[in-house]
From Swiss-Prot:
<dbReference type="GO" id="GO:0005886">
    <property type="term" value="C:plasma membrane"/>
</dbReference>
<dbReference type="InterPro" id="IPR052528">
    <property type="entry name" value="Sugar_transport-like"/>
</dbReference>
<dbReference type="InterPro" id="IPR036259">
    <property type="entry name" value="MFS_trans_sf"/>
</dbReference>
<feature type="transmembrane region" description="Helical">
    <location>
        <begin position="145"/>
        <end position="165"/>
    </location>
</feature>
<feature type="transmembrane region" description="Helical">
    <location>
        <begin position="18"/>
        <end position="38"/>
    </location>
</feature>
<protein>
    <recommendedName>
        <fullName>Uncharacterized protein in sodM 3'region</fullName>
    </recommendedName>
</protein>
<keyword id="KW-1133">Transmembrane helix</keyword>
<keyword id="KW-0812">Transmembrane</keyword>
<keyword id="KW-0472">Membrane</keyword>
<feature type="transmembrane region" description="Helical">
    <location>
        <begin position="108"/>
        <end position="128"/>
    </location>
</feature>
<feature type="transmembrane region" description="Helical">
    <location>
        <begin position="51"/>
        <end position="71"/>
    </location>
</feature>
<feature type="transmembrane region" description="Helical">
    <location>
        <begin position="80"/>
        <end position="100"/>
    </location>
</feature>
<dbReference type="InterPro" id="IPR011701">
    <property type="entry name" value="MFS"/>
</dbReference>
<dbReference type="GO" id="GO:0022857">
    <property type="term" value="F:transmembrane transporter activity"/>
</dbReference>
<dbReference type="Pfam" id="PF07690">
    <property type="entry name" value="MFS_1"/>
</dbReference>
<keyword id="KW-1003">Cell membrane</keyword>
Amino acid sequence: MAFFQKLTGQEQVNRDLLLLLCIGGFYALGVSLSNTFVNIYLWKQTGDFRDLALYNLAVVTMQPLTFIVAGRLAKQIDRILVLRLGVSCLAVFFVTVLLVGSRAHQYLLVLGALLGVGYGFYWLAFNVLTFEITEPETRDFFNGFFGVLTSSAGMIGPIAAGYIISSLHGAKGYTFVFLAVARLVSCRCAAQLFLEAPRGRGEIFIFPHFKGTE
């Protein structure tokens, strides 16, 4: 804690802030390891770019729809629960990819929708928790350090994954990478179990301009 307090100018760095950084770091590394290579893995199975287009269309369609649902749940239930739902969906996605293996191309829309739902729940909750857990004095530190983690993961992940896939024959490299990502998701699951967010104050509106008057 003392090291982080020096970085923030002797401001108090609480446990939840560090846990949120860990969760974000694990997420960034997992995404950087897998994002490009999931598409390549699916393309190698079908050889048709239209299938990849359908897969990614399912991802980007479900993500904003999930944002709306996640916003309602975050207000009415709990932001931590929404975060857990997101992490759980991402875990199920990678476990499913590992289980179906060479038959993954048969479930493109299901996999894409599952990933989009995971992204939607995760990012809504993460952004809300970032605002709630950090204080004005520690927010710059959080955003800066999170940027370092994200950038580092973005540089290391694709290189490491590419090396592993090219070093192992056949689909073994992809299986190894996806298994590593599944383990990173497990680490996120473990970290978020210890996360405690303060009770929300005020109201969360997905479309503030449509707020009714009292």
